[in-house]
Amino acid sequence: MVKVWLITGCSSGFGQEIALAALAHGDTVVATARDPTKLKQLAKRGALTEQLDVLDSDDKLTERIEKKTGGIDILVNNAGYILAGGVEECSRSEVEAQFNTNVFGQLNVIRAVLPVMRERRSGVVANMGSIGGWHGSPAAGLYCATKACSTILAESLRQEVAHLNIKVTSIEPGYFRTNFLSSGHKTSATKRIPDLAAGVDGVHAGLEAYDHNQPGDPQKGARLIVEALTGSGRCQGRELPARLSLGSDAYQMVSGHIDRYRTDLESWKDVTTTTDCDA
């Protein structure tokens, strides 16, 4: 059965690759971006294209899509970017912009699409999280915070709409070879604090060196995302998890964090469990 996808942030990177993979799967794709002129290649491949800034409230978007396609089966909340800078270095306006796109933008789109899915009693919502949502990182703390927030929102929504046959997940990619870390996609805090250099400069340099040297293949990742969200191919018969960590590096990172969290939990258990009421 042909599915209708709504994907945000399709001008490049994962958004573009997921759109192409969904088209190759035989589905209908509504690809969106702030600048629709950057969607011409997807349009040539058969995608329907729409202008969408996730910060704006477009109450008519879902209505236009329904008229064109008959509904929306799968939403991929992909639009986002990374703000690089120490927590203290990032200004209020820079932090607000990061949260507006990465968190509130996802909420805007969810609020627009969920009424359609609730009415049909079916649908899939996928927030694009990140492996960064599992841990804080020097020089990327605000980005990591937005991705942790995105994932927790998805986990909460998942429980709220499960009885309506709507599935929700957070896709958490590791490092994939897209333009995400390139100039124009990654922004940096304007302020630099010399006292923090020892804590953040290594990460700044590492992100620059890692650009286009990431281990993940975005085309392979996109194909797996399509299979997971449609329950097809390698994912047939599997229940869509609350968190879908993507990439061999993501597996290693998550495994390591779980082990460290468990160690800390157990090592403090003798004192942290002594705070209950006596009776």
Locate each region found by the language model.
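Rossmann-fold cofactor-recognition segment
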Residues: 44-57
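Active-site loop immediately N-terminal to the catalytic Tyr-X3-Lys motif
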Residues: 88, 135-141
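N-terminal Rossmann NAD(P)H-binding glycine-rich loop of SDR-like oxidoreductase domains
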Residues: 11, 19
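SDR active-site lid
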Residues: 163-239
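Substrate-binding pocket helix/loop in short-chain dehydrogenase/reductase
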Residues: 86-87, 94-96
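Active-site helix of classical SDR
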Residues: 110, 146
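Residue(s) in the substrate-gating loop at a strand-loop-helix junction
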Residues: 130
